[in-house]
Amino acid sequence: MRVIFTGGGTGGHIYPIMAIIERLKERGISTNDKILFVGTKKGLESKIVPAAGVNFKTINIQGFNRKHPLKNFETIKLFLQATKSARKILKEFKPDVVLGTGGYVSGAMVYEAAKMHIPTMIHESNSVVGLANKFLGHYVDRICYTFDDAAKEFPEKKKLVKTGNPRSQQVLSLHEEKIDIKKKWGLNPDMPTVLVFGGSRGALAINRIMLKSLMNLKTKPYQIIWATGTYYFDSVQKKLKGVDIGTNIKVLPYIKNMPGLLPEMTCVVSRSGATSIAEFTALGVPVILIPSPNVTHNHQMKNALDLEKAGAALVIPEDDLNPNNFVSSIDHILLDEKYAKEMSQASKALGVPDASDQVIKVMEEISR
């Protein structure tokens, strides 16, 4: 089976594909000649995909400008040019199936493949359907999804297949290499521990609330691993200079082996991107979610509310965030073992441990 994957711009579009590719490799499908990833030169995928040893090609495309509609004439022109580039790639590679996860590059590639009668499918990771996937839903053979709210947005009900997020299965296969928090950071493995992080670059709002809450948190009977993000680490370190933060708080720039750390955590404080949620639910980790307001269609809030509704998360909107509700939310989970266990069970019930296999099954069903 020859496969073209396409998607880009954000990790939520890229990591599900990388998880599927890893599973295909485990099944003996070579990344050398059977798999191709099509993205953009400027997107995050241009770094992640080649570094993983996966064949990578680019097409030139850009998103719609909602603030300056007149600039969208150029966007439409680029889209038409991109479909020509897509057709050339499709003719050369001759895929048996094309899978898109979102982003404008996905729109051009999957649309052109459908026009050429190549089997096509999309995967939607968020609870709010992105513009590209909403457009492609009319043309593809199958629509895979994670959240039930996303399924409601597609009128093409016969095409829908609930698969979960492929990142879930990948995380479960990785978490065997657990991090020894005592050996690595001198922390007590028998004490409740919370991980606070805002992604690899970090989140300003989360770092600010941590700085405001430190004097309270350092007196608590639990430990905190605070990953500031690489972008904010130096500025946080400057603000902490000469400040006694106690022995129960460890400040780091980022966590390299997240799947190895998550199983050791009693609770996590995080944004609510689709990839992060897939990791939390795969491992059944209770979470306090502070959704980013700076995302399209406020999809992080919708993702977070889905988890809260299931009893797997507490949600604090960024505008409502203050030291009182922040610390009391952490206390609620870390100091109430019964509640933490109930949250963990609810979280695990949402995870799909074989999500990659389910997506691959759909690929095999429709491939030519």
Curated annotation (Swiss-Prot):
Protein's UniProt name: UDP-N-acetylglucosamine--N-acetylmuramyl-(pentapeptide) pyrophosphoryl-undecaprenol N-acetylglucosamine transferase
Any single GO CC term annotated in Swiss-Prot or TrEMBL for this entry: plasma membrane
E.C. no: 2.4.1.227
A Pfam family the protein falls into: Glyco_transf_28
Pathway: Cell wall biogenesis; peptidoglycan biosynthesis
Gene that produces this protein: murG
Keywords tagged on the record: Cell cycle, Cell division, Cell membrane, Cell shape, Cell wall biogenesis/degradation, Glycosyltransferase, Membrane, Peptidoglycan synthesis, Transferase
Natural source organism: Lactobacillus helveticus (strain DPC 4571)
Compartment(s) of residence: Cell membrane
